[in-house]
């Protein structure tokens, strides 16, 4: 069953309070993390996921995005979930889990179900305490995800990638515009007030050879 978001009235007055309404709702619905509601909102707003699709999820641990995507694509779809950390969540027979670093895995290793209809990246750096360093690392992860999408995303396909807001945001957005016909920036309702993250969504991947 797709994730059911908590109502706005359920959100705590203190945005730093833990667990908040999204955390509680995720746990109640069997998802490992509240991040599921970010993907649910993006999916709802751009009609991202459909039955039978092939999906690549980069930075999949602890597994909420992959669980949601597996439900949406159904038994006729295919899902490859990749993360450096172990993933113990159950996604169903349509899913395969690869434990590895998305920055170092070859495109061939990620191509089990390619070409993909959707490439997802919720990858984020382990924060270091240095804002500049964390932003640079986030940009690097985002650009790696875009490079994977360039190699493995089917024409007409969609991309979702997380990035920390910084002076590199425009470069990241332009790189995705070079790949997709339409690009949107979305900050889901479930994002904590203190977070600097935003999601860039690319729709209608351009045909091979068509850029700019």
From Swiss-Prot:
Ribonucleoprotein listed as a keyword: no
Which Pfam families has this protein been placed in? FtsJ
GO molecular function term, any single one: rRNA (uridine-2'-O-)-methyltransferase activity
Query: Which InterPro entries does this chain map to?
Result: RNA_methyltr_RlmE, RNA_MeTrfase_FtsJ_dom, rRNA-MeTfrase_E, SAM-dependent_MTases_sf
**Gene3D superfamilies xrefs:** Vaccinia Virus protein VP39
Query: Active-site positions, per UniProt?
Result: 162
Q: Which residues form a coiled coil?
A: none
- Primary location class: cytoplasm
Its Enzyme Commission number(s) read 2.1.1.166
Key words of the record: Cytoplasm, Methyltransferase, rRNA processing, S-adenosyl-L-methionine, Transferase
Top-level EC class: transferase
Where does the record place it? Cytoplasm
Q: Which reaction does it catalyse?
A: uridine(2552) in 23S rRNA + S-adenosyl-L-methionine = 2'-O-methyluridine(2552) in 23S rRNA + S-adenosyl-L-homocysteine + H(+)
Binding sites annotated in the UniProt record for S-adenosyl-L-methionine: 63, 65, 83, 101, 122
Residue ranges for the region (Disordered) are 1-26
UniProt GO cellular component terms: cytoplasm
- Keyword flag Aminoacyl-tRNA synthetase: no
Q: Which family does it belong to?
A: Belongs to the class I-like SAM-binding methyltransferase superfamily. RNA methyltransferase RlmE family.
- Which HAMAP family did the record assign? RNA_methyltr_E
Q: What does this protein do?
A: Specifically methylates the uridine in position 2552 of 23S rRNA at the 2'-O position of the ribose in the fully assembled 50S ribosomal subunit.
Name under which the protein is recorded:
Ribosomal RNA large subunit methyltransferase E
